[in-house]
Amino acid sequence: MTPTLKQLFEKHNVKGLSNNSKTIKANDAFFAIKNGNDFIADALEKGAALVITDDKKNTTNKVIFVEDIKETLHEAIELFYPKKPKTMIAVTGTNGKSSVVSYIAQIYSLIGQKAASIGTIGVEVFGIDNFNESIGGLTTTDYLSFRKIAHKLAKNGIDYLAFEASSHGLDQQRLGDLKVNVACFTSFSQDHLDYHHTKENYLLAKLKLFTDHLAKDGIAILNSDIEEIKFIKDYLDKHKIKYLCVGANGNCKITKTNSSLKGQNINFIFDNKNYDFDTPIIGSFQASNLLIAGPSVYYTSFDFSKVINALTKVKAVKGRMERVNRTNIFIDYAHTPDALEKALTELKNIKAKGGKLSIIFGCGGNRDTTKRKLMGKIAASIADNVIVTDDNPRHEDPKAIRQEIISGIVTTNYIEIADRKEAIKYGINNLKKDDILLIAGKGHENYQIIGDEKIRFDDAEVASMSFLATAGIQ
């Protein structure tokens, strides 16, 4: 009789699971998925108790063949990491995912719940001290890694989890068969066409969140200002998915925002009632992010007045319109045409009369090349001064990337400075009273990728040091 997976694991004294030979621990079962078969010997050498493969050539007494390795992995995950927070909210969108998942977790915490968020900026935990967990460089990590973190969070008493669901992750089924209580769509614009090839493919990948992962009694929360909102609503109607729209044309209708360098006041109508609240978070585009986060929590059975009160206390996310040393220098992750346009437009609208708006940015290498020229055009059309520099060039020629950006600039209000640190110094040294400087593209990142090398680099840190040096404080 063929042993069950549980019996097999007991026989080989398996203590954990891994699908990465680099991080495998002694007595793990190693799942050789795709090119993982090339690392079976490495996994065994590092102490793997057992290897699961779908390649018959490699079988031994410790290397077991299965027909469907992904299904077997999911079965194994339920054996080893069965726990997860009781309420989960997933957020997709071109821009705004990191902000919304953090806002959701913060709201839960502010109303007395233990909550966490997972995404681009890592794992944020509220209500538990000394929780230490990191994720790799993916917005949506693989299913095994996700379930390990979710299991650990649940074991530590976390009841509420908000996480980012990227188009790559959804397309590659990194969420497995996971079901969520609420699914949010923050925004949609050009990005990742190097992977999806067309905007239609990109949109359909994101919509998998709602058809594949939203629980039957769950709700979708959509940004009504998405250009493709009619298509999205028709798609959800076709699949009988309940949804709420947030925005200027939504069921949760944003009627007015008053913004300044100190924050904003947001007015909206929800359930036929008028509300308003103040927030220190800068950016009128963040109004929709905050009001996607608020109802997300409300629809998991919390009083709306408590949610509104919490919204006034929510803090900005690192690298998202982050203000440096209370100056007029801002760090933002804007790395798409739409995000760049929104960030620049917002800062232009709130800058003092007579002040100039400058931007420092570049574009990542080995990523969507079609957006570079457009981003150059957008930057030059809104900002008074543009400084084109390097982002994460990776394996591309940095100068060629800069030239693609510059090809979209039809004015003469730009300068090219390859070294990002020097570009930031230059931008800060040339700031005058009432001027605003936006350093865009990398946001929270504390590294720069050049070739295969990851070099320590933090925009906010460099900007802070440059400002203090310019002010004569250092």
Curated annotation (Swiss-Prot):
UDP-N-acetyl-alpha-D-muramoyl-L-alanyl-D-glutamate binds at residues 21, 139-140, 166, 172, 174. It holds the Pfam family Mur_ligase_C. The keyword Cytoplasm applies. Its EC number is 6.3.2.13. Pathway: Cell wall biogenesis; peptidoglycan biosynthesis. A motif (Meso-diaminopimelate recognition motif) lies at residues 391-394. The keyword Cell division applies. It is an enzyme of class 6 (ligase). GO terms for cellular component: cytoplasm. GO terms for molecular function: ATP binding; magnesium ion binding; UDP-N-acetylmuramoylalanyl-D-glutamate-2,6-diaminopimelate ligase activity. Carboxylation is probably crucial for Mg(2+) binding and, consequently, for the gamma-phosphate positioning of ATP. Catalyzes the addition of meso-diaminopimelic acid to the nucleotide precursor UDP-N-acetylmuramoyl-L-alanyl-D-glutamate (UMAG) in the biosynthesis of bacterial cell-wall peptidoglycan. Belongs to the MurCDEF family. MurE subfamily. This is UDP-N-acetylmuramoyl-L-alanyl-D-glutamate--2,6-diaminopimelate ligase. The lineage of its organism: Bacteria, Pseudomonadati, Pseudomonadota, Alphaproteobacteria, Rickettsiales. The gene is murE.
